[in-house]
């Protein structure tokens, strides 16, 4: 089985939105997947989708972390912590994600992320995404006005405008 096929299976076992969304996600962003393998098997993966943080009119490189998952048999072995440590090393990049539940926030905090408020309202910090991201986001429900966001990197903010969540 190819790496892409393994990633698709792992993703669908953990998340699997709709067939249309899943296909578009992998067609548009497969090249942005970070993978940790045990032998030839994908044990952990996530999408690291490039975008920009616009902070007080300054454009900063950012990566949206999406669909963080580890295969059941490899959970609680520190693999995702290792994958994060190995792949989130650019000190000029801001990394951010929308946690799938309150239960995973402690893990992200241990990985260096800070919880802030995500909003659809205007703020001095806004995420700018490319057209492919906008197409994919159009297939998703929009979040409520405020929701948790986790952020890591050199950006001292407590609110982040992010209209194009993938959920």
Where do the language-model regions lie?
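Conserved GNAT acetyl-CoA-binding A-motif
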Residues: 84, 89-101
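Low-complexity, intrinsically disordered Gly/Pro/Thr-rich segments
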Residues: 146-152
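Short amphipathic alpha-helix that is part of the acyltransferase structural core
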Residues: 1-50, 58-60, 64, 119, ...
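Conserved acetyl-CoA-binding loop-helix of GNAT-fold acetyltransferases
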Residues: 65, 70, 76-89
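Conserved acetyl-CoA-binding loop of GNAT-fold acetyltransferases
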Residues: 109-118
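Short acidic/polar capping segments at secondary-structure boundaries
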Residues: 101-104, 113-114
């Amino acid at each position: 089985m190819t790496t892409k096929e393994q990633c698709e299976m792992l993703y669908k076992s953990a998340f699997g939105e709709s067939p249309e969304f899943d296909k578009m996600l992998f067609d548009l962003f497969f090249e942005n997947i970070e993978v940790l393998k045990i032998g030839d098997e994908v044990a952990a993966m996530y999408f690291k989708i490039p975008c920009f943080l616009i902070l007080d009119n300054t454009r900063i490189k950012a990566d949206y972390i999406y669909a963080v998952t580890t295969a059941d048999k490899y959970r609680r072995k520190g693999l995702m912590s290792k994958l994060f440590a190995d792949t989130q090393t650019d000190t000029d990049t801001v990394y951010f994600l929308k946690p799938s539940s309150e239960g995973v926030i402690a893990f992200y905090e241990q990985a260096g992320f800070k919880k802030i408020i995500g909003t659809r309202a205007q703020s001095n910090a806004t995420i700018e995404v490319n057209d492919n991201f906008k197409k994919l986001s159009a297939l998703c429900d929009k979040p409520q006005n405020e929701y948790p966001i986790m952020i890591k990197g050199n950006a001292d903010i407590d609110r982040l405008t992010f209209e194009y969540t993938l959920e």
